[in-house]
């Protein structure tokens, strides 16, 4: 004859955070004030026989289990434990995690902004991406001279604020390599003169280092 197993969904309690000296008897002694107990067991290690720090208590009825779980963090055998219905799982001792507390301490203005930075530290796209600073589609770059009109029209869509922040001698912190003294495309006279002197094809940035002709080389 098979016995009908009792439904313990709302009567079986998980008890965590127990001290290692807690036994079945001491666990039962604490919970018996809430009502009749069917079972009280402290889970122990099979090899050492020592407590693993948690156990289960099955109350006789649902009302007794609700009274036992009213205090989620009772003091059992001198230590703060955590109590919850077993089917709900272990309940943390503190509902607010460290991450939640840390986020609450931040100012809402920093949470809403990207990367947690204020607007004056967010560089415009023209500064963040060096490839965008000088538009690549300049047809005249294939020729020895730079088309001043095409280069000027390509720069009209940039704002004045973004253009003024561009460093002439950028530091590694901004993501650029140091160019020394550079001459931008908006100076066609310097670019044309350098091209005619050196014979090298113009690039987006031209090294502006005037060379002095030596008298002995011209002889």
Swiss-Prot record:
Pfam families registered for this protein in UniProt: RRM_1
An annotated GO cellular component: nucleus
Cellular location(s): Cytoplasm, Cytosol; Nucleus
GO biological process annotation, one example: RNA splicing
Domain RRM: 11-88
Keyword Glycoprotein on entry: no
SUPFAM superfamilies in the record: RNA-binding domain, RBD (SSF54928)
Keyword terms, alphabetized: Cytoplasm, Developmental protein, Differentiation, mRNA processing, mRNA splicing, Nucleus, RNA-binding
GO molecular function terms attached to this record: RNA binding
Protein family membership: Belongs to the RBM38 family.
Function of the molecule: RNA-binding protein that specifically bind the 3'-UTR of VegT transcripts, leading to maintain their stability and stimulate their translation, thereby playing a role in germ layer formation. VegT is a localized maternal determinant essentially required for endoderm formation. Also has some proneural function in the open neural plate and in the context of retinogenesis. May also act as a mRNA splicing factor. May play a role in myogenic differentiation.
Protein name: RNA-binding protein 38
């Amino acid at each position: 004859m098979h016995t009908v197993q009792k439904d313990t969904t709302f009567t079986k309690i998980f008890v965590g955070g127990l001290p290692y000296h807690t036994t079945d008897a001491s666990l039962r002694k604490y919970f018996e004030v809430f009502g009749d107990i069917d079972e009280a067991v402290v889970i122990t290690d099979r090899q050492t026989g020592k407590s693993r720090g948690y156990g289960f208590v099955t109350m006789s009825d649902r009302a007794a289990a609700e009274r036992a779980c009213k205090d989620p963090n009772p003091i059992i055998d001198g230590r703060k434990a955590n109590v919850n219905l077993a089917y709900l799982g272990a309940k943390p001792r503190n509902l607010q995690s460290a991450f939640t507390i840390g986020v609450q301490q931040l100012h809402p203005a920093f949470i809403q902004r990207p990367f947690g930075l204020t607007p004056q530290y967010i560089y415009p796209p023209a500064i963040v991406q060096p490839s965008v600073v000088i538009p690549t589609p300049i047809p005249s770059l294939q020729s020895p001279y730079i088309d001043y009109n095409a280069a000027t029209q390509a720069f009209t869509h940039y704002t004045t604020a973004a253009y003024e922040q561009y460093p002439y001698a950028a530091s590694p912190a901004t993501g650029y390599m140091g160019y020394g003294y550079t001459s931008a495309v908006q100076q066609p006279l310097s670019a044309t003169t350098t091209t005619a002197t050196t014979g090298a094809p113009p690039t987006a940035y031209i090294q502006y280092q005037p060379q002095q002709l030596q008298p002995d080389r011209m002889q």
